[in-house]
């Protein structure tokens, strides 16, 4: 059964504004999450007279997936962790741009999960019209410091 989200989006994502691109979680259960955003001129990637290009919706979908695992973490009294978008399959956009003022719904359905890796079928809706669809593969390591250290990168806290 889906329930309203008890947390603001800032609590669910390991991001900071202005890179938090979705506004809120509308609905979730163990199999899916639905988020919402309104396209605004002050958003990153907004182009005057055009809006936001459809390919930016990949980040909206990735953030919805991140909100899903962030919400899971908080409900289990765990820390929200950083994750990575590993790949995108079957990206299809029916429109090239999203205009200022449009309110969009982002849905991510869990397809597969095995430890630190998950696959989600995602879609962006304007009203009832599906405008973009893609399948995202994501990875959320248990120890981000070890992963980065293996690449010679130190994460500052």
Where are these regions (language model features)?
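Compact, glycine-rich, soluble single-domain proteins
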Residues: 49-68, 82-86
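Small-residue-enriched segments and motifs
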Residues: 20-23, 86, 106-108, 134
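Short aromatic-glycine motifs in intrinsically disordered, low-complexity regions
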Residues: 6-16
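Conserved positions in beta-strands of structured domains
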Residues: 23-26, 94, 109-111, 125
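Catalytic strand-loop segment that frames the active site of acyl-thioester-processing enzymes
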Residues: 17-53
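Hydrophobic beta-strand-centered segment that forms part of the acyl-chain substrate-binding groove
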Residues: 68-105
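HotDog/MaoC-like acyl-thioester-processing domains
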Residues: 67, 99-105, 109-157
